[in-house]
Amino acid sequence: MQNQVIQLGNIEIGNNKPFVLFGGMNVLESRDMAMQVCEKYVEVTQKLGVPYIFKASFDKANRSSIHSYRGPGMEEGLKIFQELKETFGVKVITDVHEIYQCRPVAEVVDIIQLPAFLARQTDLVEAMARTGAVINVKKPQFLSPGQIGNIVEKIAECGNNKVILCDRGTNFGYDNLVVDMLGFNIMKKVSQGCPVIFDVTHSLQCRDPFGAASGGRRDQVTELARSGMAIGLAGLFLESHPNPNQAKCDGPSALPLSKLEPFIAQMKAIDDLVKSFEEIDTSN
């Protein structure tokens, strides 16, 4: 199978390369907390030898309730991202929701993310592609893995071939998600080998049908992440929080920051083992 590799500074993102950790927090809650979380991730990934990219949102524009916290906004968020880059030397990924956000965000961060709920909005996809930035496409919960190729084609038609694909679970009836482990390789094939990563924490979301915010199953984050890493992926997408029960968004799915090192150590061990195997072609 063809494997494309995206070079981001000294980080190689590819399905046959050592996995890259896209990690941080769901939404920027404060400058100080962002610094705390990023510092911990940098400490752990440097110790374990894992390539690392910081992730967080400056605006959670798709919150269920009008009363839910959304974030500091683009202007303040970009200031925080710039400080993180200067302080820790990290690459940064964040999402955009509006066409006008694409260029200013791409001037600061290293990867711009297409949210799952917006992944079929052609005007937004084209605006993101034309920045020339690396784009992380979140596969919509309602879309089959094979359909992701159409989104990749839209980006390519704008002259951008720097695409990462991310699975964050698939609708399973109402208010629940499951992860189709067979879908990862389908996404690789229909995209001609784009790097594929796994958003394990969002895949753990589940809802109270009448609630205003998502619930989650963080007690299962390790077993689900182990399963995904056994496929052989370009990266793992992970959200953590110093105190998940007090997080302003998606705390029930977040890995406690104190558990980061043993968690990532296990993921690296699985990735190293799986990618040491010779590929077996069972198609004929």
Curated annotation (Swiss-Prot):
Protein's name in the database: 2-dehydro-3-deoxyphosphooctonate aldolase
EC number of this enzyme: 2.5.1.55
GO molecular function annotations of the record: 3-deoxy-8-phosphooctulonate synthase activity
Primary location class: cytoplasm
Pathway assignment: Carbohydrate biosynthesis; 3-deoxy-D-manno-octulosonate biosynthesis; 3-deoxy-D-manno-octulosonate from D-ribulose 5-phosphate: step 2/3; Bacterial outer membrane biogenesis; lipopolysaccharide biosynthesis
Similarity field: Belongs to the KdsA family.
Pfam families, alphabetized: DAHP_synth_1
The keyword NAD belongs to this UniProt entry's keyword annotation: no
Localisation per UniProt entry: Cytoplasm
Keyword Transmembrane: no
Designated gene of the protein: kdsA
Gene Ontology CC: one annotated term: cytoplasm
